[in-house]
């Protein structure tokens, strides 16, 4: 009996692995029509008795402001061009910070955020963390860095029911994703830790300070020139 159950379990794992690889390969070239987070927000609104209309318009890489691309990396994941989905230095720093008490600091890379927003449910469990690591590894191996950032910018939440750079730019500033200024891009990046509480168009003093810090980091990273590193700077994880 146990042997039969174990065999069935292995079959489930095998077919899940095959299906997830095929899905990730598909989304390398096809825009994801929706994400798990979008479904979650929609269902939440139904149960709350206040259904929302999701705002989202996919736009290709060239139709997104370079300032926004750099601002998001500056604010969320400065080592994005170099790592393979996991920033172990940031993880160690976050653990040390959290052990000292105070506010909880996360260390999720952009790749990890794409994995959980696109494929997974909210919550904290070992199963979810394991699946997040699996999907993160897949997209890092099967997608170029530019594609990971493109999907992130088109799927991240920027306000209640507002997903992606195009919808966010029009919702907050009345411009296209391509037309975002450096300052507007920094404000959008500044609210990403908590976009349902903070507003890019009506920033608190904290958000304004964080946006100013992000603009400073953008300059230190080299501005638009930092985008050149996206598909060239990464080394194999076993290399020196």
From Swiss-Prot:
GO cellular component annotations of the record? peptidoglycan-based cell wall; plasma membrane
Part of which pathway?
Answer: Cell wall biogenesis; peptidoglycan biosynthesis
Q: How does it sit in the membrane?
A: Single-pass membrane protein
Catalysed reactions, as listed in the record: [GlcNAc-(1->4)-Mur2Ac(oyl-L-Ala-gamma-D-Glu-L-Lys-D-Ala-D-Ala)](n)-di-trans,octa-cis-undecaprenyl diphosphate + beta-D-GlcNAc-(1->4)-Mur2Ac(oyl-L-Ala-gamma-D-Glu-L-Lys-D-Ala-D-Ala)-di-trans,octa-cis-undecaprenyl diphosphate = [GlcNAc-(1->4)-Mur2Ac(oyl-L-Ala-gamma-D-Glu-L-Lys-D-Ala-D-Ala)](n+1)-di-trans,octa-cis-undecaprenyl diphosphate + di-trans,octa-cis-undecaprenyl diphosphate + H(+)
Q: Which UniProt keywords apply?
A: Cell inner membrane, Cell membrane, Cell shape, Cell wall biogenesis/degradation, Glycosyltransferase, Membrane, Peptidoglycan synthesis, Transferase, Transmembrane, Transmembrane helix
Pfam families hit by this protein: Transgly
- Subcellular location per the Swiss-Prot or TrEMBL entry: Cell inner membrane
A Gene Ontology annotation in the biological process aspect, one of them, is: regulation of cell shape
Instruction: Please state the Enzyme Commission number of this protein.
Output: 2.4.99.28
Described by its record, this protein's role is as follows:
Peptidoglycan polymerase that catalyzes glycan chain elongation from lipid-linked precursors.
Record's family?
A: Belongs to the glycosyltransferase 51 family.
This chain belongs to which protein, by name? Biosynthetic peptidoglycan transglycosylase
* Naturally occurring in which organism (per UniProt): Pseudomonas fluorescens (strain SBW25)
């Amino acid at each position: 009996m146990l042997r039969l159950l174990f065999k069935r379990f292995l079959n489930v794992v095998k077919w899940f692995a095959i299906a997830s690889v095929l899905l990730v390969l598909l989304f390398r070239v096809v825009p994801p029509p929706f994400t798990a987070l979008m479904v979650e927000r929609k269902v939440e609104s139904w149960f709350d008795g206040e259904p929302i209309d999701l705002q989202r318009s996919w736009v290709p890489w060239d139709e997104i402001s370079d300032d926004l691309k750099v601002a998001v990396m500056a604010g969320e994941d400065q080592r994005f061009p170099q790592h393979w989905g996991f920033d172990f230095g940031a993880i160690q720093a976050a653990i040390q910070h959290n052990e000292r008490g105070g506010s909880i600091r996360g260390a999720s890379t952009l790749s990890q955020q794409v994995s959980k927003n696109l494929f997974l449910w909210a919550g904290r469990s070992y199963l979810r963390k394991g699946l997040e690591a699996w999907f993160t590894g897949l997209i890092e191996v099967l997608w170029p860095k530019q594609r990971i950032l493109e999907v992130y910018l088109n799927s991240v939440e920027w306000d209640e029911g507002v997903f992606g750079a195009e919808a966010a730019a029009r919702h907050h500033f009345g411009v296209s994703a391509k037309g975002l200024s450096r300052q507007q891009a920094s404000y959008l990046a500044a609210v990403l830790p908590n976009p349902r509480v903070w507003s890019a168009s009506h920033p608190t003093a904290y958000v304004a300070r964080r946006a100013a810090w992000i603009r400073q980091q953008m300059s230190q990273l080299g501005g638009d020139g930092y985008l050149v590193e996206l598909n060239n700077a990464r080394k194999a994880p076993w290399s020196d």
